[in-house]
Amino acid sequence: LANGPMREEIEREGGLKLIYIDPPFAVGADFGFDIEIGGEKAEKRQTVIEEIAYRDTWERGMSSYLSMLYDRIKLMHSLLAEGGSIYVHCDWRVNNAVKLLLDEVFGSSNFQREIVWRIGWISGYKSAAPNWIRNHDNIYYYTKGTNFTFNKEYIPYPAGYTRRDGAVPEGAGYPIEDTWNCSELDKLDSIQIMSFSGEKVGYPTQKNENLLARIIRASSKEGDLVADFFGGSGTTAAVAEKLGRKWITCDLGRFGIHTTRKRMIGVQRELKAAGKDYRAFEVLNLGKYERQFFMDNMVNGARKKKENAYLSLILQAYHAQPVESFKHLHGRKAGRMVHVGPLDVPVTKQRVLEIFEECKTKLITKVDVLGFEFEMGLMPNVFDELREQGVDMVAKYIPKDVFDPRAVEKGQVKFFDVAYLDAKAHVTKRKVKIELVDFVTKYTQDDLEDVEKQLKKGAKVVIENGRIVKLNKDKDGFVERTVLTESWQDWVDYWAIDFNYRDKKEVIRVPQP
């Protein structure tokens, strides 16, 4: 977005016409989420990169938060079209400081309104504050210049409404003010308060669609490009698609991206069923750009130097000791040899067989094979065959966390065994039926024995070795284990099939500056 093909595409569209952001404004915000299996909930904790990103955001309190936000808002300002609008959603913890920041970037003369959004009817512990009950967020509305789009919104008059003189009122209704959800006619309650809303997707900071629809209708036109750079559950994208706008949404959290993707597929189906047009969308992963750092300029002596730096980095993150005098083996850890796969291509069957031959020659029986990607078909058949021939090979993914030096230094990088899907093809004449047989994962987040020791009384759900297990400890210290993942299908949230798949590389050419 700062400088590349995506920015060029935005500029070709004439720039962003509308930006809505709801940046994190609570210390301790994270990317964890709940997985529901068999009526029980297990927490899927955030990745190392996600955890560090928010830890850094609040490392020095408000100053580090504003530093993070300032850089991003400056970039958003540069991507915004002349006459474009931005809405920044925040609350009492940061609103004064954020407004000063927006004045700095956009200019105080381009401040249009401070919208006060009453969150909704509250009860229970939320109503037990020692003084006035806090019940609103702030949304700051700025524009880039004075020639901006604004489509005035109205609340329709109630059915049967007449003026004092008995006349039927003219016009579309009451013009909407800068205080929202403050009357029976203006219903914009928080999605968190509307407990039975069908919109809910289980995301902790989700905003309701009516709130975003009001903003998008007012400050953009059909076909305009709308963006949300703290995408969360994808509400902005979902509403923009329904209202005929083009959209871009970004998020650091994997669950946010997954939730948005799933939600947008649902929006497409909804629009298709209604006979309305909808657009295809793409999920772009920035994870490979860290790898690009090591691949750039790998020529002559620089190539060898970077290869050595890459091997050293991966071995350090894996807590392995480097070894020499081997062709395909690079390290040793806990009685197992370690092979570090290439940076720019998948680990292939040919490479695995070469590792196997060297192990047989050197009388080595245990190897961990680390890689960013693996050739299709390696798991489980090839590894099972080599295990039967005397070499126990385990394939593990190299996570993108390895490119964050803070995560490596703190020993927080985790390498997970490669998960794989087992499928069978049934061919009948000119028809092919694909049967999904199994999904094999050894994903581990907890240690059952450790959790049992620490659990004083009650229940806890843990994830270990591809299983979700509920532990229940009674007052006498007896622990009952219940496996909640009875079927491999319990791990699958949804399936997606690319019917237009083509087995060829997508090439994006970027002109040299």
For each predicted feature, which ranges?
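A short glycine-rich, Lys/Arg-flanked "PGG" loop and its adjoining helix->strand segment in the class I
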Residues: 70-82, 361
